[in-house]
């Protein structure tokens, strides 16, 4: 269904999921497009970013950000154009980075909007390699991982928007990079396009043995996006004074209980202690928001020089957002997942 000029479609949280989200956890609503008041702008969503963190916002467990309440619009970063403006700093047709969520239109007072120029070459990249995922990769690896030339860097979810960027930055810093991904096609992309030294399929029956063979000198940096059995295979290979930037644990986002089997916490704690391993979680905007301009300048330069490659998976139509999101959580995506809402994209 095409975007309309006078009606606003929006996906709201219909109910909180128990386990993996299902279609009945979402509800598509529609009403008239609102009119901006004094000091406000009306934004039309062109691109919507879908990211794993949104699963946490669907639950009401305590976290670093408040949950989406039932009946409210699903959250999400967006690239938008100004339709109408009563704000002195914005004019119609301008492109902006915004936070409209899963809907066609939104009203903003201008706070938090980032101008993208009149005719950005790749506007959706502001939701990926030049946005939150790229920033997450950059700061997590460089500030927490602190890569050194000749070290072995292992990256989980190696072809996702964060993992792919981590691995490429690691190569720029002189690391030997081993990726972990799901399936032969993704692994080929990691080595042939992204320049990883190796990439292993975590679906393989002998994955732990393959990882040990791929890292004969151990692991100096493990960029954690996944958790679960991948982390179990990594743990015994970690070197003394290794570093683990903890970005995400997507394998457990839909979990409703602790995994079966023995308690692994004592082994983890003992390994961290004996090997003096640094394991640090981070929330990108809260912890590193003040360094966004540093990232934008450096990443922009690398892209211009052809040193960073980026892949998107674009789905057309706001109506397809829930299905694309559920596929993302199931690992069916190949690249940054973006919903394209408008024909001018």
Where on the chain are the PLM-derived regions?
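C-terminal hydrophobic helical "lid"/dimerization subdomain
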Residues: 2-6, 286-345
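Glycine-rich beta-strand-centered segment in the early N-terminal region that forms part
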Residues: 32-50, 58-102
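NAD(P)H dinucleotide-binding glycine-rich loop of Rossmann-like/cofactor-binding domains
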Residues: 74-81, 89-157
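Short glycine/proline-centered loop/turn elements that form peptide/ligand docking sites
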Residues: 85-89, 179-189, 203, 207, ...
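Short glycine-centered segments of the SAM/dcSAM-binding site in methyltransferase folds
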Residues: 95, 152, 176, 242-243, ...
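Mid-domain Rossmann-like dinucleotide-binding core that forms the NAD(H)/NADP(H) cofactor-binding site
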Residues: 127-205
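Short amphipathic alpha-helix with an adjacent loop that forms part of the alpha/beta core around
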Residues: 206-216
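Glycine-rich phosphate-binding loop and adjacent beta-alpha segment
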Residues: 229-308, 342-345
């Amino acid at each position: 269904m095409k975007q309309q000029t006078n009606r606003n479609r929006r996906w709201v949280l219909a109910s909180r999921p128990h386990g993996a989200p299902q279609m009945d956890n979402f509800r598509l609503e529609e009403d008239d497009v609102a009119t901006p008041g004094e000091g406000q702008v009306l934004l039309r969503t062109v691109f919507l970013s879908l990211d794993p963190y949104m699963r946490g916002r669907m639950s009401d467990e305590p976290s670093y950000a408040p949950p989406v309440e039932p009946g409210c619009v699903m959250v999400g970063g967006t690239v938008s154009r100004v339709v109408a403006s009563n704000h002195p700093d914005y004019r119609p047709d301008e492109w902006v980075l915004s936070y409209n969520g899963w809907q066609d239109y939104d009203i903003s007072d201008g706070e938090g909007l980032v101008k993208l120029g009149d005719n950005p070459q790749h506007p959706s990249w502001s939701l990926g390699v030049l946005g939150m995922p790229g920033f997450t990769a950059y700061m997590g690896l460089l500030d927490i991982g602190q890569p050194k030339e000749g070290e072995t860097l292992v990256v989980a979810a190696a072809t996702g928007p964060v993992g792919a960027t981590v691995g490429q930055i690691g190569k720029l810093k002189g690391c030997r990079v081993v990726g972990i991904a799901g399936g032969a096609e993704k692994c080929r992309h990691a080595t042939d396009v992204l320049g990883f030294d190796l990439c292993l399929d975590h679906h393989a029956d002998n994955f732990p043995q393959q990882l040990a063979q791929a890292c004969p000198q151990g692991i100096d940096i493990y960029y954690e996006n996944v958790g679960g059995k991948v982390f179990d295979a990594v743990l015994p290979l970690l070197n003394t004074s290794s570093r683990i930037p903890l970005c995400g644990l997507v394998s457990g986002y839909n979990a409703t209980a602790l995994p079966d089997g023995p308690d692994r916490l004592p082994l983890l704690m003992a390994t961290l202690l004996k090997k003096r391993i640094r394991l640090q979680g981070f929330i990108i905007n809260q912890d590193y928001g003040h360094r966004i301009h540093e990232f934008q300048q450096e990443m922009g330069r690398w892209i211009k020089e052809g040193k960073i490659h980026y892949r998107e998976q674009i789905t057309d139509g706001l109506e397809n957002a829930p299905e694309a999101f559920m596929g993302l959580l199931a690992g069916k995506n190949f690249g940054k997942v973006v919903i394209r809402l408008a024909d001018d994209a």
